[in-house]
Curated annotation (Swiss-Prot):
Any one cellular-component term (Gene Ontology): cytoplasm
Location within or outside the cell: Cytoplasm; Nucleus
Organism: Candida glabrata (strain ATCC 2001 / BCRC 20586 / JCM 3761 / NBRC 0622 / NRRL Y-65 / CBS 138) (Yeast)
Description of how the protein assembles with itself and partners: Binds the proteasome.
Chain intervals for the UniProt region annotation (Disordered): 1-27
Highest taxon listed in the record's lineage: Eukaryota
Classification via InterPro entries: Cut8/Sts1_fam, Cut8/Sts1_sf
Protein purpose: Involved in ubiquitin-mediated protein degradation. Regulatory factor in the ubiquitin/proteasome pathway that controls the turnover of proteasome substrates. Targets proteasomes to the nucleus and facilitates the degradation of nuclear proteins.
Name of the protein in question: Tethering factor for nuclear proteasome STS1
Family statement: Belongs to the cut8/STS1 family.
GO molecular function: proteasome binding
Amino acid sequence: MSGQMFWGKKEDGKRKRSFQESYETPKVQKCVRKRRPALNVQGQPLPPQRSLEMMSKDQLMSVLMEVMRQHPEVGSTFQAKVSSYQFASEKYQQLLKGKVEQLYSNIPYNRSYDNTNLDDYAFVRMKPYITELLNCLVDCALDNLPPRKSDLHESLKFLESCTQLVLDLPRFESGSNNYYYDKCLEQISHLWCSLIEQISKDIHMVMNTNMEEWITKLNAYNERSNGLLTSAVTLFKSLASDGDLLGDQQNEMESPAYVAGPGLLLESNPSYLMHNKYSM
């Protein structure tokens, strides 16, 4: 009896141990993370190409002008590259139109833009826009003269539009405040004389240009400018007279009785070429 009880207790102990072992909580292995190198990424400016794509026209112009001031050799290289470009007449007109609009927008509110009696206060306010417009106009006019432009008819039309633009600008009560306008008209007169000089060297241009029409236009502009374009009018009249003489001699050349001479040379007029840019 005692032996049975002994063995029974033994078996009960084994059962308890096996039961406990079967239901023991499994050991959880700790997950150790490997340390990664820290990512130290910092912002950086756009490269030049992207910056150029993002910049406005004014920003780009400001940066470019500053670079050329600091490095004159860059300006020389830039000028050499750009001088080979040919722009359409509409581009010049669009540029000048923007300058004119800036000038008109700075006329004081108590004055109308078509008023020819603007006061001193208006002049002080408008002066930087006047000088910017007139300098831009002369730059554009020079770029439309030979040899930059080979079409003399186009040069005539553009120079006429420049002349009319200056004459249409609002004037001031004080004559001294109109100095920049008058000085610019004097320079435009030199440009007219230079262009007429070029026309006089082209026989076909002389023969195919309506001189009387251009003389009439220039006379009207000269009256509005108080005689500042007189030299251009005089030179155009001289060219018209030479053109009439040339036409008579051309008819003689076409007649059967004409005997060819040493060759016809159109007498050159005094040179009015402007060598320096107009500065305010």
